[in-house]
Amino acid sequence: ANQVYTKFEMIKTIDKVGTSDGVFRKYQDNLLTYSKDGISAYDKDGKQLWNQTYEMQEPIVVSRGGHVAVADYKGGVLYLIGPSGNATTVETNLPILDLDVSSSGIAVAALQDDATIYLRMFSATGDVISEIKTSMQKSGYPLAFSISPDNIKVGVSYLKAEGGKINTSLAFYNFGDVGQNETDNLVSGYDYAGELFPLLF
């Protein structure tokens, strides 16, 4: 049988945080909110933990653990934010298409240089660790990608349009010892005709 509730008890209230046009997302056991003007983290009581301002048209925000990576779609600046709110600003000099970050703060960004795509890996302090160069003609458009918890493996979903049909190629790169002897660190790949993989985890 269905239960019917006729009253409630208010246990706790907090003031609204963020902006009216902000996007809200879970951030560990806290709250992350961002907009075109900046990004902030709040605890359960609504107390601001940290804040980073910027100016973006279409912010891309990814978080894992206490680490956050933020960039404007097709912009050239990447923000790497640690658990305490300390931020590193990275000038990529190329438009950013997508990005991901690991729980230890290692970030990977897909950068576009005309028809050439670079998958560039950054340390939490913004140093370039590694880079893979590919092309849209060879691999396709990087639709989504994800970095492994050990910061070594990266999976990429490439979108290809061939003969009026949409196909997806999944490529898996290894930046560790296993991938050192492979061309472009590519250790495996799979093609899926007529399939679309917009997300990777």
Describe these PLM feature segments.
Residues 8-40, 44, 51-62:
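Beta-strand-rich domains and repeat architectures in extracellular enzymes and scaffolds
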Residues 34, 71, 109-112, 156-157:
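Residue-level marker for isolated small/hydroxyl-bearing positions within beta-strands
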Residues 31, 68, 106-108, 151-154:
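Hydrophobic beta-strand positions that form the internal "hydrophobic ladder"
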Residues 3-16, 45-53, 84-91, 128-135, ...:
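A short beta-strand motif characteristic of beta-propeller blades
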Residues 16-26, 55-66, 94-105, 138-146, ...:
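Repeated scaffold domains used in trafficking and secretory/extracellular systems
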Residues 41-103, 198:
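Structured, soluble extracytoplasmic/luminal domains of envelope-associated proteins
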Residues 161-201:
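Extracytoplasmic/luminal low-complexity segments enriched in Pro/Gly and acidic/polar residues
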Residues 38-40, 76-80, 115-121, 162-174:
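Structural motif
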